Amino acid sequence: MSKMPLLNARELAKILKKLGFELKRQEGSHMFFEHTDGRTTVVPNHPSEDIDRGLLNKLVKQDLKMERERFLRSL
């Protein structure tokens, strides 16, 4: 099983858009994305920092409701 890559908020936002998510709003340092099927996720937007692998795993599994390998193939 591959390790989750280190991604920053901009890179993750591009991947989410590719997967069909749309940026609905941004409040402070958090971006709120929504999919047409109702799935939602919030991504912290700190430009100089990568998103922690633990948080990225949580987003993929719980928010995106995707298998980790499917997410990695979408990179």
Please name every model-derived segment.
Residues 1, 45, 60:
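Generic anion/oxyanion-binding catalytic loop in active/binding sites
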Residues 1-27:
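N-terminal first-folded block
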